[in-house]
């Protein structure tokens, strides 16, 4: 193939899925001349699986992306067909927003957003090779021979990386949704010395809405007063579409059991490791054989399509078996299957080959983000893409990378887990993975991250001024409640009695009364009137910060303790072989991961407290080993 010089850029982003679009937008908006290359321009920000955004932990990630200046939250607010706040009956640490998106509107709106950015060039092209000079990535080469040069490159190829679709006995090379896969780039990464592993994910069949008997299902409406993902969104759409709940049954399970020998999950044809937290229906009936039924949610894929996503029925059984089992489910007895469910296997770069900036250790100037790093989910991909784009642009401008701490963001937890622990299966973000989840809430993402977003140039001055005003209003109202004393008047006592709260014996500070579990900020506002208007967002923040003050303080003390460990940096030139006393496994892991701090070293699987003590003594005594020649 004859090659030709096709142009020079600051940053090149390979792929335009959920990681790629955030990487490209971040880089371009920070002032870097950015090229985005994608196999198919019609697939920008496409949702090949569930047409939804958010959920536990993931919804908080979308808020964090928005607080830093990313696009996923704004785009979802423009294109949702249903919005629900989950876990409203639980504490604020686990509340999360989830949207059903119009998958077609979502991708078209995102593509239009990218096309409007003056620093971004969006082109169709299949990247086969990287341009590497002296261990530094200098650009990419496409299958048409075009050579694009750049100072940094971000790979976000997702499940296209040597993708293979599997349906029963049928197996063929393909990206998601029967798109062209990226084969040669995977081969090239292996040639460069990267360790790749085969992972697997799956998707359920899509069925025709007009052939569903919804009277046999349970309606799942959106919230009456939907909330936004983006801190910029003002007006919310009230015209929402419902989802519908139904269940599998013993007949469904019998059909699946009878055909397990034809499922790639249980035959030698499956090579990739699947996602633990997104099991196929075959996997569910085997692992949970005692359950007589499993939930199935029928989710519309958009306003202008008949296609309905059958959530909970991810499968790679043969096509005729899928049709048969669908028709055993209440409401789907006469359903028409429009698209068959399938499994897809793909290559993932083992993420312990990355620095916390998402730059690869093997090749300078090369970043990876999204499912290629071993994660599952649009939100996890978008969060990584944003950080990779930010750090790729900052490297161009000779600035230090932005690395979010585990106490700052779920995105920080995600990336730290990946680069420190690696992953043996597709990684899904869960609230249980965050040790400081009371600090990493849906409601306070802007308070945690807007400062950083503004500092790096992704949050406008106008939005930053609004943020500062909100911050001031929260503090002013908290201070007012700390100073305002409520007297035990007849009116107050009657209100307390009505809601089952103990009567007052003496006067009480408004803040102390608010700490009672049954007392809301609205109740306090009825007793203690205020002169200035307080938005619902500010009221919510005041209530949470006052009510959970003790728990938040405890978490902050834990963070301070952890930060002292983060501040103990491990010198770049350390020779672990020169440290006597380290366990063999710890020595191997420390040499492979190359942690930046004692705190990161302590989180590596196989490195125990005794190893950390030895490492600390070695560093503190100044015994920094010789630099390898």
UniProtKB/Swiss-Prot annotation:
The keyword Flavoprotein applies. The keyword Lipid metabolism does not apply. Belongs to the MnmG family. Residues 203-227 are annotated as: Disordered. Homodimer. Heterotetramer of two MnmE and two MnmG subunits. InterPro entries: FAD/NAD-bd_sf, GIDA_C_N, MnmG, MnmG-rel, MnmG-rel_CS, MnmG_C, MnmG_C_subdom, MnmG_C_subdom_sf. The gene is mnmG. One of its GO terms (cellular component) is cytosol. It is found in: Cytoplasm. It comes from Listeria welshimeri serovar 6b (strain ATCC 35897 / DSM 20650 / CCUG 15529 / CIP 8149 / NCTC 11857 / SLCC 5334 / V8). This is tRNA uridine 5-carboxymethylaminomethyl modification enzyme MnmG. Residues 215-227 have a biased composition (Basic and acidic residues). The lineage of its organism: Bacteria, Bacillati, Bacillota, Bacilli, Bacillales.
């Amino acid at each position: 193939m004859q090659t030709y010089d096709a142009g020079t850029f600051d940053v090149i982003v390979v792929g335009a899925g959920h990681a790629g679009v955030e990487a490209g937008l971040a880089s371009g908006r920070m002032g870097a001349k950015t090229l985005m290359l994608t196999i198919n321009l019609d697939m920008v920000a496409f949702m090949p699986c569930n047409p939804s955004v958010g959920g536990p932990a993931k919804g908080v990630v979308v808020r964090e992306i928005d607080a830093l200046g990313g696009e996923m939250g704004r785009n979802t607010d423009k294109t949702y067909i249903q919005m629900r706040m989950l876990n409203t009956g639980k504490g604020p640490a686990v509340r999360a927003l989830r949207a059903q998106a119009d998958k077609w509107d979502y991708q078209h709106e995102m593509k239009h957003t990218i096309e409007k950015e003056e620093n971004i060039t969006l082109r169709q092209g299949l990247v086969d090779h990287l341009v590497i000079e002296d261990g530094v990535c200098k650009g990419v080469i496409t299958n048409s021979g075009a050579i694009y040069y750049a100072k940094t490159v971000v790979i976000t190829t997702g499940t296209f990386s040597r993708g293979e679709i599997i349906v029963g006995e049928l197996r063929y090379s393909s990206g998601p949704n029967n798109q062209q896969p990226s084969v040669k780039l995977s081969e090239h990464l292996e040639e460069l010395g990267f360790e790749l592993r085969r992972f697997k994910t799956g998707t359920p069949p899509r069925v025709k809405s007009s052939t569903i008997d919804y009277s046999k299902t349970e309606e799942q409406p959106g919230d009456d007063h939907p909330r936004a993902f983006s801190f910029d969104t003002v007006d919310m759409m009230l015209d929402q579409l419902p989802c519908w709940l139904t269940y599998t049954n013993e007949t469904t399970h019998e059909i699946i059991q009878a055909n397990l020998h034809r499922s790639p999950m249980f035959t030698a044809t499956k090579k990739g490791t699947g996602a633990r937290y997104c099991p196929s229906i075959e996997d569910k009936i085997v692992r949970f054989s005692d359950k007589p039924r499993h939930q199935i949610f029928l989710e519309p894929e958009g306003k202008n399509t008949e296609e309905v996503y059958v959530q909970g029925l991810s499968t790679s059984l043969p096509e005729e078996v899928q049709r048969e089992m669908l028709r055993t489910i209440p409401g789907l007895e006469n359903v028409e299957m429009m698209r068959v469910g399938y499994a897809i296997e793909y290559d993932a770069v083992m993420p312990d080959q990355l620095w916390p900036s998402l730059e690869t250790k093997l090749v300078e100037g090369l970043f990876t983000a999204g499912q290629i790093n071993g994660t599952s989910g649009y939100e996890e991909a978008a969060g990584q893409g944003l950080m990779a784009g930010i750090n790729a642009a900052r490297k161009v401008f000779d600035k230090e990378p932005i690395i979010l701490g585990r106490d700052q963001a779920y995105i920080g937890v995600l990336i730290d887990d990946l680069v420190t622990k690696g992953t043996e299966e597709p990684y899904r973000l869960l609230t249980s993975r965050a040790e400081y989840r009371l600090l990493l809430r849906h409601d306070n993402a802007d308070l945690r991250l807007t400062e950083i977003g503004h500092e790096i140039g992704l949050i406008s001055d106008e939005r930053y001024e609004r943020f500062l005003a909100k911050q001031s209003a929260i503090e002013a109202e908290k201070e007012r409640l700390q100073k305002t004393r409520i007297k035990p008047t007849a009116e107050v006592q009657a209100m307390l009695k009505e809601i089952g709260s103990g009567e007052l014996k003496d006067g009480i500070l408004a803040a102390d009364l608010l700490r009672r579990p049954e007392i809301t900020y609205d109740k306090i506002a009825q007793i203690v009137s205020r002169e200035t208007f307080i938005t619902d967002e500010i009221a919510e923040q005041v209530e949470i910060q006052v009510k959970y003050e003790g728990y938040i303080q405890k978490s902050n003390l834990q963070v301070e303790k952890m930060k002292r460990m983060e501040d103990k940096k491990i010198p770049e030139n350390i020779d672990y072989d020169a440290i006597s006393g380290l366990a063999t496994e710890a020595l191997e892991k420390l040499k492979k991961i190359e942690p930046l701090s004692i705190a990161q070293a302590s989180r590596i699987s196989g490195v125990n407290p005794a190893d950390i003590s030895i490492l600390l003594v070695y560093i503190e005594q100044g015994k920094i080993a010789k630099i390898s020649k």
